[in-house]
Structures are given as C-alpha cells and as structure tokens.
Amino acid sequence: MKNKTIYYWSPFLTEIATVKAVINSAYSLRKMSEDFEVTILDAAGEFKKKTSEILQKKINLLKLSNIDYINFLPKHGKILSRLSFFLIFICSFFPLKKVIKNKQPDFIIIHLITSLPLIIFYFFNLKTKCILRISGYPKMNWLRLFFWRIVLKKVYLITCPTKGTYNYLKELDIVNENKLKVLYDPIINVNEILKEKNKQSLKFEKNYAIAIGRFTEQKNFEFLINAFKSVVKEIPNLDLIIVGKGEQKKLLIKTIRKNQLEDKVKILEYQKNIFPFLKNAKCFILPSLWEDPGFVLLEAAFMRCLIISSDCQNGPKEIVEDKNAGLMFNSNNLNDFLEKIIEFKNLDNSDIKKYKLNALKACRPFTIFTHGKNLKNILQ
C-alpha cells in the first residue's frame, strides 16, 4: 500500500510555541505508523537551526528557497514583522504552488502564514487536501472574516486546539460544521521531559514563582511585575523569575526599576530547557490576555508546578477552571489576582496535591501519543 504523504507549512520569524507543535505533530505521525511519509516545508531558512532535530526524528525537510533570507528579515515590531511575512508570502507563492502541484502530497497541514496556501488552493485545482490548523486564539476582524468565508470553501478540514475555539468558529458559521475538528496540540513529549527535567545550569537558593513566555503585550508581564509589588507584602520570602525574550524586554526592566523590585524580580533570557525551573518553582503564574491553549501552562502542569492563571480565552479556562487544576483570577484584575495569591499562601498540602494531580490529568490529551493517534484517525 502506498504511503500517505503529509506536508507541513509553518514559516516563522522567531521561535514560538507553534514551531514546537509542528515538529512534534510530524514526529507523532512518524511514531504512530510507518505508513506516513512526513515533510516540513522550509520557506526561507527558518527551520535551518532545527535541521538536526528534524532529521533525527526521521522527518523530511524540503527547502523552497536556495537562500536563507530569513536572516535578513526584521523580526520584531508589528509593522516590520508584517512586512517580513509579506515578503515570505511573495517569495514563496510560486515555489509552494509548484511543490504542491508536482509532488502531490495527500495532505498539507498549514499553521502559519496560512493566507498563502489558502489562496493557492482557492484559485488552483489541486489534488492535495488542505488542512487548516488554527494556531493560537483567532482574533477576527471584518477583513479576516470576509477572507475566510471565501477561501475556506476549498479547505478539507479545520482543526482547533481547544473546544472553545471550535465553538467560536461554529458560532461564526463561516464554514460547514462537518469540517471542524478538535485536535489538541502535541505539547507533552514524556520521554524528552523526563530526560531534561534534572539538567539545570542555574540554581536559585530562594523560593520563587515563575512566569515564562515571549515578552509581548499578549503575555501581560508588565501587569505581573506591577502586581508583584503587592505580592511581596503578602509573601516576603517569594521572588519572581520571568523567562523569555521579545520586544518588551526594556519595558519590563523599566517596570521592575519603577517598582524598586530589582532584588525580587529577575529576568532570564530564553531557556531551551525550562523544565528544571518549573520543577523547583513554588508556583507558575500565567497572566496572559489570551492563550490557545497555552503550551507552557501544560508544561507546568506536567511538572507538578502549582498553577495560578488568568481566565483568558481559551486554553486556561478549559485546562485550569474546568479541570479544577489550579487557581484562576480575572484577567488583568489586580484585586482578584492578589486574592488568589493570598489563597495560594494559605493552601494546605492536601489542596496543593489535589490541584497538582488534576493538572497532571489535564495533560493527557496534549501528549504526542494522543495527538498522533487522533491525527492518524483524521487523515484516514
């Protein structure tokens, strides 16, 4: 029997959680069955640093350009990053169309810069089936709504990372309901985490809470730093470590100084292995304005790190609130956040164990194995 060929399309400027999801998804199919031949498309050289990992996992990597022009594109700022995405769109249009037409993969799963393959599939009659993967919470404006109403007619399926996003798209009524599927992201690689969790290059003697993510408006770390001035009054022996990188780094440092928290709040550059930090933290705080589902939230849950999360759409509500897997505060609400901090301070061991166990159970749908099994069923 002929192997099914699956292509992944997900160009990116900076390494975000979606990149990990793409590689893990491709890997999950390879692990699930040898009947799948899986290829990641490299539009501009963005996957170059991931080549060894991709090949080690027996995933093919197909370059669409001989030049790694990703190195010359601006990566931060709304206007400059959108300009970079536009350039990738223009430079990849004909190479992507040619590859799909000539190679004729059975499926192409599209994660980022999805407008390009959506337009190609709308205007050209191709044998390949296109699956749109919703990566992150879809913010709808009239232009995207209009665009999706037109181009989604040619899409084979749309997979949603949470039930909340599934229900949201269903209510919008922009596509046949039969095309919508819930497919949880492959966030938890159990074997990999077990290997990495004890490898720690930095050690902290003090008790600390931890927050992890890109330094962007979405992650809302400025709110957390401002709030931590009050947290210190409630729990004087608790420090805060924020791990990540991004365009708001200078703003966050300025906010720390403004609140005179230099001795209590530390910023660490992006860490490839965050599991030891989660393992030793007293709690994980997620102050985000939106997440779908929230990769690091699930990694914290798997590491048995007590979760204090905002109630932002969509993932945290489904993971933390619905599963009783931690403490949840009203997003961007200082008073409610401080109430949850006081509740955290007064938790007894039985409550802590209950939250941690529920959080661990909530991780099950997000393992590589579960994702691979469910994606295999979708493709067959």
Model-derived segments and spans:
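Short His-centered aromatic/hydrophobic patch
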Residues: 88-92, 110-116, 134
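N-terminal strand-loop element at the rim of the active site
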Residues: 8-16, 28, 32-83, 179, ...
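Aromatic "clamp/platform" in nucleotide-sugar-dependent glycosyltransferases that forms part
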Residues: 270, 289
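Short hydrophobic beta-strand element within catalytic cores of glycosyltransferases
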Residues: 306-310
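Conserved acidic donor-binding segment of nucleotide-sugar-dependent glycosyltransferases
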Residues: 322-334, 343-349
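A conserved mid-protein helix/loop that constitutes part of the nucleotide-sugar donor-binding site
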Residues: 16-24, 207, 211-233, 240, ...
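A short, active-site helix/loop in glycosyltransferases that binds the activated sugar's phosphate group
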Residues: 155-180, 187
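A short, well-ordered alpha-helix in the C-terminal region of glycosyltransferases
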Residues: 336, 350-365
